[in-house]
Amino acid sequence: PIVSKMALLDDNLSKALKLLADVPLIDGHNDFPYFIRGWFPEQIDSLDCRNVRIAHTDLERLNQGRVGGVFWSAYVPCPDRHAKNDFVVDAQYESLRATMQQIDIIHTLIERYSDRLGLARTSSEVWEVFRSGRIASLIGVEGLHQIANSPGVMRNLYRLGVRYITLTHDSNNLYADSTNSSGPFHGGLSRDGISIVKEMNRIGMMVDLSHTSVATQKHVLAISKAPVIFSHSSCASVTEHPRNSPDDVLDMLKANGGVFMITFIRKPTDAESPTLEKVADHVQHVGDRIGYEHVGIGSDFDGVMLTASGLDDVSKFPLLIAELLKRGVSDHSIKNMIGLNVLRVMDSVEEVSMKMKETGEEMLHEVFEEIWDEKMRDEVRKTRDIFD
């Protein structure tokens, strides 16, 4: 069990468990599917996901942690050529193939453990799965390199259940600059990036700004018609780190209506002492700065070797909630943070999508590689007796 019998008597922990029974705790980012790919490359069919002690995540500990929903990340690494700002599509086909494999792993887990997990694509489906006693399973993609420069691929990812895409991972791409790269290339969003954000708004795909440069974050927050998320990020005012966002970005996020989901990654949490308490500091900073209706949790479990101490695996979420209650954070604010905020954003993103489609917003087209030459076109005209 996650706590001793004596600890269960603690008022804050008891209250935390009650709150987690009322509202689904939705983790904005979990990399267990990629851990499966790395640790069990030839054993996926026989893997027992109820107990995987080598990982941060398994079904038993998700239950112990009272997790109500997870955005499973269909992450794959950036192509090597992206490090040189070479975004040629040929380098991304392997990323696309691996992305489809990762989405297959996620769907396979949901199907195999249908008594524990349920696919969720909308807020209503999250509630339906949660109230059935299962964990709502949502899908995120961690980088636009995974769409192989194709809006059509992105639309198909949405059809497969993907509900957010992080604009970048560790490298710049065709669309945007990353904070982890050697330096800016576009100065924020590129022209293609502006178009892809608009298309994400149109189809109802949440924009995720974790990993992006501050310039990219500000650019998106200035143009997005829908609220955005930071699926796993931290605050620069609490800890200086390249991945952490400054207060002026948080202020723009408040105006946008989005959610900043605090991560458990050690260095962004605190270079010297990354602890549960320090994670709580980041949560409180967002809450105090822009309101608890704009903060969430995005652990990055199984995306890093170690997380903040005290938050060592998915069973430990109640301890963070108890710490925040101890600090005086209200029940209402806790409920917003653990799940209601991201569910609100999901609803808002859908509403924006519906309005854009109703007003005839044009889809983002792409130019296909030519497959017919003029000789072939002439043959079609001749055969069908149709001439210009």
UniProtKB/Swiss-Prot annotation:
A matching Pfam family: Peptidase_M19
Any single GO BP term: proteolysis
Keyword annotations of the record: Dipeptidase, Hydrolase, Metal-binding, Metalloprotease, Protease, Zinc
Cofactor: Zn(2+)
Catalytic activity entry: an L-aminoacyl-L-amino acid + H2O = 2 an L-alpha-amino acid
Protease is among the record's keywords: yes
Pathway: Mycotoxin biosynthesis
Induction: Expression is regulated by the cluster-specific regulator verZ.
Recorded phenotype for the gene knockout or disruption: Completely abolishes the 11'-deoxyverticillin A production.
GO molecular function, one term: metallodipeptidase activity
Enzyme class: hydrolase
Positions that bind Zn(2+): H29, D31, E142
Similarity comment: family membership: Belongs to the metallo-dependent hydrolases superfamily. Peptidase M19 family.
This protein's name: Dipeptidase verJ
Organism: Clonostachys rogersoniana
